[in-house]
Amino acid sequence: KAIEAMERLGGKYPIILKTLTGSLGVGVIKVDSESSLHSTVQLLYKLDPNMGVLLQQMVSVDYDIRAHIVGGKYHGAIQRPVVKKDFRSNVSLGSKPSKIELTDLEIEHCERAAKAVDGLWVGVDIFPSKNREKTPPMFIEINSTPGTKGYRKATGENLAKNILIKFKNREIWLKPNTYKSMFDS
């Protein structure tokens, strides 16, 4: 099935394979050929027959952007340069983040992406277009548990603390539990 999915991406290598349970850049693999894809999927299946994977087109860039969307609204973003001698831009792997301002178009698309997954707080990872004012970004992924270390390094803001303060008195936390077990009458 991975080979079929690869062909739907256009059949051009290299591609990126991601495990659905990875984080911090772990589980992100650059695959250079069909035989490498086959071997990688076999290994992952051997480790966990239920492991889900995602295939993505490889895009060569100097950096990506992580936009933090909190409560459906854009909060801020960081630019993450690709790590030297690697293809990933995770802060946990050594990327040196810096604060970046998004265009109105980028903010609109990132907020729409967060709304699509119903995320209270998500990290939307994008590749900016060449004409950032007029052309939408390319989406990499939406992280339901984004890290805050890079954001704090780049901005000095304690994002996690500010999010907790923002959500402290929200109605969502005050709703009664409506779930019942089979033993409840």
Identify the meaning behind each predicted range:
Residues 1-27:
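A conserved helix-loop-beta module that forms one wall/lid of the active-site cleft
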Residues 67-70, 134-148:
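A short beta-strand motif that forms the metal-chelation/ATP-contact edge
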Residues 15, 76, 122, 138-141:
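Protein kinase-like catalytic core scaffold
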Residues 25, 143-155:
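Glycine-rich phosphate/pyrophosphate-binding beta-alpha loops
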Residues 24-111:
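Phosphate-binding site of ATP-dependent enzymes
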Residues 14-17, 52-55, 121-124:
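A short linear hydrophobic-aromatic micro-motif
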Residues 88-135, 166-175, 180:
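A long amphipathic alpha-helix within ATP-dependent nucleotide-binding catalytic cores
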Residues 20, 58-59, 68, 125-127, ...:
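Anionic group-transfer/hydrolysis microenvironments
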